[in-house]
Amino acid sequence: MVKMGEVWTNTGSALASLVFIYTIFERFFPYRLREHFEPLAQSLIGFIYPYIQITFHEYSGERFKRSDVYDAIQSYLSKDSSSRAKKLTANTIKGNKSIILSMDDHEEITDEFQGVKVWWQSKKHQSESRAISFYPKADESRFYMLKFHRRDREVITKKYLNHVISEGKTIEVKNRERKLYSNNPSQNWSGYKQTKWSHVTFEHPATFDTLAMEYKKKEEIKNDLIKFSNSKDYYKKIGKAWKRGYLLFGPPGTGKSTMIAAMANLLEYDVYDLELTTVKDNTELRRLLIETSGKSIIVIEDIDCSLDLTGQRKQKKDEEEDEDETSPIEKQMKKDQGENKGSKVTLSGLLNFIDGLWSACGGERIIVFTTNFIDKLDPALIRKGRMDKHIEMSYCGFEAFKVLANNYLDAKEEDDNELFDEIKRLLEVEEIKMTPADVGENLLKKSEVETKEICLKRLIEALKEEKEEAKRRIEDEEKKKKEEEEIKRKKREEKKIKKEEKEEKEENETTMKD
């Protein structure tokens, strides 16, 4: 009787011989000849190894964006990883209230679907390059490998993969936490496949109910946002990218950032806070846009201060002139220390970011610009079609005050009629200008013993002080204006006297010659 050990030994020797013969065959036989033997060789290999493998890369080809299929598979496998895998990776979600376990690198688990057994492997490929790299992660690539028997090909390709993607996306929605993103400086990207955005959990409590603004204006903005979020088919019908632009303008402290948070909470969108000064050029700006997801608000705060779009040519020219006078060592030091310090994003690049071809990548995005000085912005940047809705965030009016009083003190007009009437007179009749931020600070209780009456009276005193301060500012401005006019008058007189002296001198010289 043949022993089992001898059987495995003979089988192993046969397989090794086949592999050796196949290698010689591929290397030395002409391609035309191999074409005739290829089907036979594949049949033989299939008989010995009847399994099929499908690879799902994290990044495919030259795409900048991470594969949605890869993400869906990762979410799907996390469902069973905790009970089947031996090596796990833990991630927190929803404010660290729960933990998601997923397969670690080089781990394998099994799955079953309609009686069909499959194997999933999580793999990471490390480049074998021996070159020293300051950014080793740039040479890594991750992928999932699915293995199944060839007899189950139809079930896997037509049913199982669709099941995995569908279930994975459902799990993604269930575990989704809204995030606040910030773009990383480009020198830290370490290759285009690295993280361009860092994020934290978005937990801002602002809502339209707590926003200090007139009720009618708030409802108008809310209706506009809700209409946009439900208009995918409409935007497709009219041939426009599914996006909308909002320009928030007004003095500091009028609630522009709070408005953005309220918008995100209303629509349950992520927020991308884009810092333009860290973006090197238009190409990097496009890459950042590609990495944003749908259902998101892309914010550029203080757009008038983010980039000097009008003065870049002069700055570049000055730098080129200075470069000739710089030694090679100094040039390299400047390059290492501040290569990305000066952004080369242009106005045309920013406009293309808003409504060019690249703005159509993805969908359901809101782009928000904020500024304290709308007059400083290029008209091309804020025209309708780019910034579709202009929202002025003004000083606190009486309607906005009532919202703040209710938020901070649970105070209502009918309960504190006299104090409310005085505040109404100061805000509407006296037209005293105070930002919602300053009003809120005066309404905030500073200790447990303070009552709402004390806080309301403190606000009244602050409004009266603001009135006096406004008068002083006007007087100072008038005084300064008069002083400037006096200086100009004296300069004109001095100029006139010098001119007369010059003419008199020339006249005397002419007389002496005669």
Curated annotation (Swiss-Prot):
Expressed in seeds, specifically in the embryo. GO terms for molecular function: ATP binding; ATP hydrolysis activity. Residues 311-342, 467-514 are annotated as: Disordered. The keyword Transmembrane helix applies. It is found in: Mitochondrion membrane. Residues 331-342, 467-502 have a biased composition (Basic and acidic residues). Belongs to the AAA ATPase family. BCS1 subfamily. This is AAA-ATPase ASD, mitochondrial. It comes from Arabidopsis thaliana. The gene is AATP1.
